[in-house]
Amino acid sequence: MGKNLLACAVAAYALFGSIGSAKAEEFGTSAQARPMIQRAIDALKANEGDAIKAFGDKNNDQFHVLDLYVFCINLADGKFTSQLDQSLVGTSAEDLRFGDDQYGKRILSTVRGAPEGKIISVAYNALRPGTNSGAVPKVSFVARVGKQGSGVGYYRQKLQPSQLDELPPTREAARLFERDRS
């Protein structure tokens, strides 16, 4: 009887422990986004056309993990060349906005001004797809590689005031987020 009880306890722990783990791993993190943007930089340097195709392949786990994905913007015209939402390919990144925050312009301006291959962070507010929870702070790691601006964004659960100074180009987005929460 003791062995059966122990077996049931182990099975229950395995079941409920895995449910909790699945929930915790529903969203990508900064630690996952940064290596992904580095892989995107390397792929763009190797072959831009092949890289953009790979970024658009939702089954390619090098560039799609949980809610993380690589996006690309043609720096000459500001239009998406790769985006998870295929309906955005060919549209202007400058049109992305949340309320008064025209974060698409900020992303494009940041990546255009970035040194070649250097990863820079940009923070803004965005709606998390599939939720009705309102705006969530989001940070995108972006880089300029040749004619492309590339990025990978992850959602932050809560932006702490001390973090505002860590990401200088993002302070205004953080202030807007805090203002909108009040």
Predicted regions and their residues:
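N-terminal membrane-sensor/transducer module of prokaryotic signaling receptors
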Residues: 2-182
